[in-house]
Design a protein with these regions (language model features):
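Glycine-rich oxoanion-binding loops at beta->alpha junctions
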Residues: 79-101
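A glycine-rich beta-strand to alpha-helix segment
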Residues: 100-109
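Active-site acidic carboxylates
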Residues: 1-83
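A short glycine-/small-residue-rich loop at the edge of a beta-strand within enzyme catalytic domains
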Residues: 59, 84, 88, 107
Length: 109
């Protein structure tokens, strides 16, 4: 049975929405992704859902795209650097998951 998400028991994870990865997508699609991630972040903030973000090898792939990166910063969202494909292999990310202990994770990216 499907259950309604409880914001305080959920986690929003923004995964690898970065400059060089975005450049590989059609501009109109990336603009749509950026807009939708922005709406998701606003909803998370209004509803009190915790948020985390990852960046895959930011030296090579660049930072999180604007305005998403700026919004994450304004919200005080931790960003975890990773070089492995899986975010859950990053110890800091795993620690945050354990702290929040979400019943659901909403993934964007």
């Amino acid at each position: 049975m499907l259950k309604r998400l409880v914001p305080s028991k959920s986690l929003v994870a923004v995964i690898d929405v970065q400059d060089r990865l975005a450049a590989a997508m059609p501009k109109e699609k990336m603009a749509d992704v950026a807009r939708k991630v922005g709406v998701l972040l606003e909803a998370a903030e209004l509803l009190g859902a915790p948020v985390v973000a990852t960046e895959q090898y930011s030296k090579g792939l660049g930072p999180t795209i604007e305005p998403i990166g700026r919004r994450l910063h304004e919200m005080g969202v931790p960003r975890f650097e990773k070089t492995a494909f899986s975010a859950v292999d990053v110890p800091e990310f795993q620690k945050r998951l354990e702290e929040v202990a979400p019943s659901a994770i909403v993934v964007a990216g």
